Amino acid sequence: WKIEMNAAPRSPLSRQQMAVLMAMLVALMPFSVDAYLPAIPEMAQGLKADIHLIEQSLSTFMFGVAVGQVVGGSVSDIKGRRPVALVGLAVYLVSVLLLSMAQTGGQLLLLRMVQAFGAGMTVVVVGALVRDYYEGREAAQMFALIGIIMMAVPLVAPMLGAELQKLGGWRAIFVFLLAYAVLLLGLMAGFLPKPAKTEKIGRDIFAVVAGRFKRVLQTRAAMGYLFFQAFSFSSMFVFLTESSFVYMKLY
């Protein structure tokens, strides 16, 4: 087996351009979650499904993201960040294309999970890419730039989704996500260079990955942060799941 070293080739992009590209990759998540929230009631009617079944697509999406990040993070250490991101985007692209043609609530749930798996594989490499290409203060500045750009996405996504719904119904939202994925795939393929160096590891890669997860699980501070973040996400998604339906019924 080979595992990618931290020493990656210098990116052909400037620091600002790299920050925008990384932010666009991370934005895949909030766009995928927030853009279709205003359309949940219409989706339930169009698919002739119970509203609560459509709401479950948020839960299935987060499950798929979790699995995609675990798989993508581990594989990216072996095969490199670029191929994992490209494969993740390809999976995302195909699933969104099929989502735009979904006919039942069951198809929606299944395809949302596949979409989330691709999104998880893609997004998980962002932090690693920044650490690969930048060090010290420069890396901190990159993360700050990405954070600034990312702050606007959860605000814009629901409004964008509502406008797309007015123009072409709820399926137009997934057509937009398809176009966005195609754009990202082209940018990643064209501007993210292949890793310059690899190193061999002399033991079973699965044992190496399992050992890393074991160290994380045995670190008390890390587990505290994980549980805190999990409960924060739980509260947020309870609100996201119910809010659009309540607002549209009351206002």
Model-based region annotation:
Residues 6-11, 195-225:
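Juxtamembrane intracellular "pre-TM" segments in multi-pass secondary transporters
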Residues 17-51, 72, 239-244:
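Extracytoplasmic
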Residues 67-106:
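Conserved MFS/SLC helix-loop-helix module at the cytosolic interface between two early adjacent transmembrane helices
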Residues 46-48, 80, 101-107, 118, ...:
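Helix-breaking motifs and short loop linkers at transmembrane-helix boundaries and internal kinks
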Residues 111-150:
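Cytoplasmic helix-loop-helix junction between adjacent transmembrane helices
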Residues 103, 107, 136, 144-190:
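Helix-loop-helix hairpin linking two adjacent transmembrane segments in secondary transporters
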Residues 106-112, 224-225:
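Short hydrophobic/alpha-helical segments at membrane-entry points of transmembrane helices
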Residues 59-72, 127:
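Central cavity-lining transmembrane alpha-helices of secondary-active solute carriers
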